[in-house]
A protein has these predicted regions:
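Repeated loop/turn-to-beta-strand initiation elements of outer-membrane beta-barrel proteins
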Residues: 36-38, 114-116, 172-174
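Transmembrane beta-barrel strands of outer-membrane/channel proteins
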Residues: 40-46, 118-124, 178-182
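Solvent-exposed loop/turn elements at secondary-structure boundaries
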Residues: 131-159, 163-235
Length: 235
């Protein structure tokens, strides 16, 4: 039977960073008249995200056996991710998005035991133009019109909502609540900022396997555990 062993840090933790800043400005106006309480307002939301993810950034070696490892034979496979710059220092992609919203709702006390709430929210998310176009990718998928710096277009989200509160017995011992509506959340920021970091413009990954001759560079004294040493051996 085969035995599989891993030694060292996992391939996904090195270089991880997640930093998000959110600023929200809200202004509401409420007006009560008769059985109605009307609320209207506007909201501005800013989200900025910095992300670091270098899968296999600390180097990854796969050997056919323990004997191959201790005898310094060439590995079966190797991978490393590094920055696309001369000093190979990790870069942390950043992206910022904004969203503009307006909304209005009415709380109508139709009966002392029954309240109906209904409203409408309009949201316009705006995404920036990314500076991460991979020219080779653009040329390869020119027919489809795909580019690594594409972001979602600014579409208006229309979200109607309605809900009710029913005091069945009139003594608040049995209350039935319900509602429905359209609720649009934000796109996960990590998806957007990863488009910057993983487009092969900020960082790149080298993967060697099979009969790739460069694997022989890691035979003998070619095996290293420090990242500068690994990159020096590779390049």
């Amino acid at each position: 039977k085969a035995v599989y062993t891993t030694i060292g840090l996992d391939p996904f933790t090195y270089g991880n960073l997640r930093d998000v800043q959110t600023v929200t400005v809200t202004d509401n106006v409420t007006y009560a008249t008769g059985i109605h309480t009307i609320t209207a307002g506007a909201q501005f939301e800013y989200n900025g995200a910095t992300n670091g993810f270098m899968q296999m950034g600390n180097g990854y070696f796969l050997y056919a056996s323990w004997d191959d490892f201790v005898n310094k034979n060439a590995p079966l496979a190797f991978a490393i991710t590094h920055a696309n710059r001369t000093d190979l220092k990790q870069q942390f992609p950043f992206i910022a998005t904004t969203k503009y919203s307006v909304y209005a709702q009415d709380e109508a006390n139709l009966h002392k035991q029954f309240k109906l709430t209904y409203g409408l929210r309009l949201e316009l998310p705006v995404y920036p133009t990314l500076d991460c176009e991979n020219a080779e990718f653009t040329a390869l998928f020119k027919k489809q019109g795909w580019q690594t710096n594409q972001t979602p277009k600014a579409y208006l989200n229309v979200s109607p909502r309605v809900g009710f509160n029913w005091d069945v017995l009139g003594n608040r011992r049995m209350i039935v609540r319900g509602g429905t509506g359209v609720f649009a959340g934000n796109l996960p920021m990590v998806w957007l900022v990863s488009a910057v970091g993983n487009s092969n413009t900020v960082q790149a990954q080298t993967l060697l396997s099979g009969n790739n001759a460069d694997l022989q560079k890691f035979a003998g004294d070619g095996f290293k555990t420090d990242i500068p040493g690994i990159l020096q051996t590779l390049y």
